[in-house]
Design a protein with these regions (language model features):
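Positively charged, amphipathic and often flexible ligand-engagement surfaces
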Residues: 1-338
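Alpha-helical bundle segments enriched in helix-capping/polar residues
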Residues: 337, 341-345
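Short, intrinsically disordered, charge-balanced linker/junction segments flanking boundaries
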Residues: 345-351
């Protein structure tokens, strides 16, 4: 409540990992129903927008995978539609969290089906999370914009840098894929984030996408504010931060820029917190992380405020040469066994 009185809003994340059984999925479904009902009954506090709920699709179906596409687009769709309809009735926004790259196309297909559902027409409060470390991030944003224009829909869109980087790298190596689905340099991800932010604040998305920029990097936040001023879209977007992080940074943003800021807050039992906490530590505790470098006395301030494009230009290639491509993982001893990602439509079409 004190944070909301200061101007913050919230997005509540019900803790829990991917459902392995139908019982798991039903438990998470009940948790989401309760969360929506609880938030919906709370009176509005402070000047910020009403709190929202973040939904993890893999928690709502034990077979959330491309091989089970038909089941996903019927059974999982029905679950999410029920939650979204319930949320609409109680004026609680819904945001669908991003997960691994393998599930991206399937999640977009399901999201499109939700936007086309008669029960959700004209709502404008069912959002999506997109990851800037993905090489497909900008094309996804363009596709979503065209979809929104076709349907006359407005969608909240949370832009994050991504929390599954280690998983994506290791999976691509284990499967012997041709390349990685994510940028292998942090500077590449930071540059992608700013390129996507520029697009989201441009006239192309106006009236279609409501941008939500999630970051704890002070340079990124400053760049977004500058891009918004340049695009003449002041305050027609919001920032987001994790609970317990970025307090001083975003207190300043609210005070000096009167900008909406939403706190992403985990909710659940202690036993469910560990996987979430590990992802946050991997994301923000890496040596290259802004948050990590900020408290390192050996890192000069100049390097913290250096533009990521400037940093990226110092390298000979966009790819990190210290992370060999999956086929060359065991070079020079031998070539890695080759695999094919059947969850990506482009790979399937090439067969």
């Amino acid at each position: 409540r004190p944070q909301r009185e200061k101007g913050y809003s919230y997005s509540f994340d019900m803790l829990g990992e991917a459902a392995l059984t139908q019982d798991d999925a039903e438990k998470y479904m009940a948790d989401y129903r309760l969360a929506i009902d609880t938030v919906g009954k709370e009176p509005q506090v402070g000047p910020g927008p009403r709190p929202s709920i973040s939904i993890k699709l893999s928690a709502l179906h034990p077979r959330y995978e491309v091989a089970q596409r038909e089941r996903v687009l019927t059974e999982l769709f029905a679950n999410v539609l029920e939650l979204a309809s319930r949320a609409r009735a109680l004026d609680v926004g819904i945001s669908i969290d991003a997960e691994e790259a393998d599930r991206l196309e399937l999640s977009l297909e399901l999201y499109e089906k939700l936007l086309r559902a008669p029960a959700l027409q004209g709502w404008g409060e069912i959002g999506l999370v997109v990851q800037a470390y993905s090489k497909r991030c900008l094309p996804v944003l363009v596709w979503l914009t065209l979809l929104g224009k076709e349907l006359g829909a407005k969608m909240p869109l949370r832009l994050v840098k991504g929390a599954y980087w280690d998983t994506e790298i290791k999976y691509a190596q284990q499967q012997g894929l041709d390349n990685y689905p994510v940028f292998t340099r942090k500077e590449g991800t930071d540059t992608s984030y700013l390129a996507c932010a520029r697009y989201l604040l441009s006239e192309h998305t106006r009236g279609v996408i409501y941008p939500q920029f999630a970051s704890h990097n002070a340079h990124t936040v400053s760049c977004v504010l500058a891009l918004a001023a340049e695009a003449k879209t002041p305050r027609d977007f919001e920032f987001q931060r994790l609970h317990g992080m970025g307090d001083a940074l975003y207190d300043t943003v609210i005070e000096q820029h009167q900008q909406t800021v939403r706190i992403y807050a985990p909710v659940g039992a202690h036993k469910d917190l560990l996987p979430y906490l590990v992802r946050r530590l991997l994301e923000n505790g890496a040596n290259s992380s802004f948050v990590h470098q900020l408290v390192d006395p050996g890192v000069p301030v100049e390097s913290l405020i250096d533009h990521p494009v400037t940093q990226l230009r110092k390298f000979a290639s966009l790819a990190n040469d210290k992370i060999p491509l999956p086929p060359a993982l065991f070079s020079p001893a031998r070539k890695n066994s080759q695999g094919l990602n059947m969850n990506i439509s482009a790979a399937m079409q090439a067969l």
